[in-house]
Amino acid sequence: MAQDRECLCSAGFQRGDYTQGNTDRSTAAANSRPPAGQRGAEEPSSGGAGTPPPAAVLPTMPDEATENAGSTSARVSSFFIEDLLGTEGGGGTRRAAAGGGGGRGAPRCGPHSPLRLGASGCPLRDAAVGWYRRAFLGCASPDTSDRDSPELPEDTERAGGGGRAAARGPAGGRQSSGGREEEEERGEEAGEAEQRAAGRKKKTRTVFSRSQVFQLESTFDVKRYLSSSERAGLAASLHLTETQVKIWFQNRRNKWKRQLAADLEAANLSHAAQRIVRVPILYHENSPASALGFGLPHMSPPLVGFSGGVSYPLGTFPAASLPFLRSQMTGLV
């Protein structure tokens, strides 16, 4: 029993030492920590190289501050002369001199403010206002807008393509008005051409009275072609123009030629039909063969009868048809 009590006492003593050691350590750590205000100031220095400090706490150098201020001021469109001259510096005077020498020698009125600035510091409105001011003061004509207008950087020109068109307002207006006038003139010319073509197509046909047609027909039967004097006299007597009489005679001659061609064609067809028709030959049975006179041409030939009841002598037939007649007669016998 005594041994058990000694073991328990030793165990409790060790446990008490352990808890006391832990409490001593916690108090020492609490005492070693700095106050809240000092802790925020010391944390950036004790952070190490691996962890970057916050951006708001980083100290800024004077050069960086001036650069940031210059960039913000350049981004903001400022219209003060001091800002414009300060941003460009000494290079502005050289550019202004080069730009002035590149013109056509037009006189410059008043002080020339340099407008050729960077893309961020040169607004397009300044260029337009300066150009209009010079144009209205009579320093330069609007026709020389390409050379007298201030040259802008490429970025500004791309960004403000519509502004340049606005800056060329007077010249563009003239060109557009001239183009409209040309289009109107072309439209009028096209309309006149259409009217002329329509007038040519709508030719009215001359209507002749019965008395005029009778007189023209009687004159045509007498003479197919008229001289100029005859045509003039006929036109005066019929109260017509010479052109109308001339055209009527031309049409009448064409009609007459067509009628002649049709008559000739009909005559040729009838003649061909007459050649094709064959007529059978009949002879008398009692008449001897020697009486026909084929071998004696000096004797008067007898009559040969046809089916139509008409008799023709053999002398009327040509000599070439005698073999044909002989073959026909021998075939019938």
UniProtKB/Swiss-Prot annotation:
Ranges of Basic and acidic residues composition bias in the record: 144-158
Annotated motif HMX family specific domain 1, positions: 261-271
Stored Pfam families? Homeodomain (PF00046)
Kindly list the biological process annotations in GO that this record carries.
negative regulation of DNA-templated transcription; regulation of transcription by RNA polymerase II
InterPro entries on file: HD, HD_metazoa, HMX_Homeobox_TF, Homeobox_CS, Homeodomain-like_sf
* SUPFAM superfamilies reported in the protein's UniProt record: Homeodomain-like
Give the CC-aspect GO terms.
nucleus
A Gene Ontology molecular function term of the record: DNA binding
Extent of Acidic residues compositional bias: 181-192
The Swiss-Prot or TrEMBL record marks DNA binding at 201-260
Q: Where is this region: Disordered?
A: 1-74, 86-109, 139-204
Gly residues bias spans: 87-105, 159-176
**What compartments host this protein?**
Nucleus
Q: Where is the composition biased (Polar residues)?
A: 17-30
The entry assigns this protein to a family as follows:
Belongs to the HMX homeobox family.
Function, as annotated: DNA-binding protein that binds to the 5'-CAAG-3' core sequence. May function as a transcriptional repressor. Seems to act as a transcriptional antagonist of NKX2-5. May play an important role in the development of craniofacial structures such as the eye and ear.
What PANTHER family would the database entry show? HOMEOBOX PROTEIN HMX (PTHR46110), HOMEOBOX PROTEIN HMX1 (PTHR46110:SF1)
Protein name (Swiss-Prot/TrEMBL) = Homeobox protein HMX1
Q: Which organism is it from?
A: Gallus gallus
Q: Write the lineage as a comma-separated list.
A: Eukaryota, Metazoa, Chordata, Craniata, Vertebrata
